[in-house]
């Protein structure tokens, strides 16, 4: 329990630190960057959809492009997951994402950092156990070398 709380607090502090470290945009800058910001919002939503498609297809190469090497996630069950584990799970028979229906997403961009929140309904298996249901989640992205890469994620399974 204490470890889970520590990991949760660490993730929250990391996300807050990244967001707070970004410079504030001036009002004049906001109008100049509206079109690029809209393009970035569309790009991030597409990445989220690509992530779901790659998970369904067990496409380790595509997942590897989306996830930063340092990516860490706090799963719905309170366990942390790394990029290496997700890529290894693409080769495991007891893990699958059979159906995935994306719900609405909200994207907030702070310079080279973005936070995407959303929901999905899925039919899935993890370690041979049914994990199907409705989830809400948060993904944190950082733009590295011109590409958005996921650096942190958190998901919560909603009660039935």
What does each model-found stretch correspond to?
Residues 8, 22-160:
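A beta-strand edge to alpha-helix "cap/lid" segment located at domain peripheries
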Residues 1-22:
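N-terminal export/membrane-targeting signals
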């Amino acid at each position: 329990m204490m470890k889970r709380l520590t990991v949760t607090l660490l993730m929250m502090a990391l996300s807050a630190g990244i967001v707070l470290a970004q410079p504030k945009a001036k009002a004049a800058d906001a109008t100049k960057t509206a079109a690029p910001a809209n393009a970035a919002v569309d790009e991030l939503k597409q990445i989220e959809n690509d992530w779901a498609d790659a998970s369904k297809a067990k496409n380790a190469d595509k997942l590897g492009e989306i996830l930063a090497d340092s990516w860490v996630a706090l799963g719905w069950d309170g366990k942390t997951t790394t990029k290496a584990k997700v890529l290894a799970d693409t080769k495991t028979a007891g893990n699958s994402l059979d159906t995935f229906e994306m719900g609405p997403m909200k994207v907030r961009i702070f310079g080279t950092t973005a936070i995407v929140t959303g929901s999905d309904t899925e039919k899935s298996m993890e370690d041979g156990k049914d994990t199907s249901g409705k989830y809400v989640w948060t993904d944190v992205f950082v733009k590295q070398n011109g590409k958005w890469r996921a650096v942190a994620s958190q998901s919560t399974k909603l009660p039935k």
